[in-house]
Amino acid sequence: DQISQTFKDLSEKLNLSNTDFIRTTEQRHIKTVQYLWNELEKNGDIYLSNYTGWYSVSDEAFYNNNEIEEVDGKKIAISSKSSVEWIEEESYFFRLSKWEKPLLDFYESNPSFISPESRKNEVISFVKSGLKDLSVSRKTFSWGIQVPNNKNHVIYVWLDALTNYLSALNYPETKDRLFKKFWPASIHLIGKDILRFHAIYWPAFLLAAKIDLPKKVYGHGWILSGEEKMSKS
């Protein structure tokens, strides 16, 4: 509540306005996330297994071995320099590997989908290196949106958070005025550190759920302070 109010206060000081302010704790969002989960599961794109690997709490992201380095005896993510921990737990997975070719085909058919060109090349290179199925639930904490029909699992934050683009437009009510007017989105303007989530994972979720993709994803750089990013996104 405190952090949410801080954003509202800052917007007022900067004389910024918005037509809606959505929080992922709202019932309309929870309803949309669980509906999307059920659609993905119904289509065979979610299954239960076990996850073993590196996870960064601060980045809220999973990392492969080639994305990790050791500095002063501690394991960190190469891209963000955030500490990572080794976890082993039961998890639901999204069949991301299934969507490797459809994603590459989509990028080729829609060359302006990712901008600038350097970001597009990063994404295509990452996808071509081979996509592994993505862990989309956690058991080690209780806060978050519960997996439908399994109270022991909480939905992974990025599947949850990305869905706010749809819940703000009252999805799955596709005939709703807001959804018809604003989806597909003209552009997702995001920081380069969350490009993978918006240009790979999010499009794969949407393709699997048979939902139109946004028209463009633009990954901008960071404002630096002492050669480190000031903003998370």
Please name every model-derived segment:
Residues 43-49, 109-114:
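Short, polar/flexible loop-turn hinges at active-site or ligand-entry regions and domain interfaces
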Residues 7, 16, 40, 73, ...:
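N-terminal, helix-rich and Lys/Arg-enriched segments in bacterial and organellar proteins
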Residues 44-100, 104:
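Cys/His-rich short segments
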Residues 23, 28-32, 36, 79-233:
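Structured secondary-structure scaffolds
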Residues 11-12, 74-75, 177:
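Short, flexible segments with low predicted structural confidence
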Residues 18, 51, 212-214:
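Short secondary-structure junction motifs
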Residues 1-48, 205:
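N-terminal Rossmann-like or analogous alpha/beta NTP/dinucleotide-binding catalytic cores
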Residues 9-14, 55, 192-200:
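Low-complexity, flexible helical/coil segments
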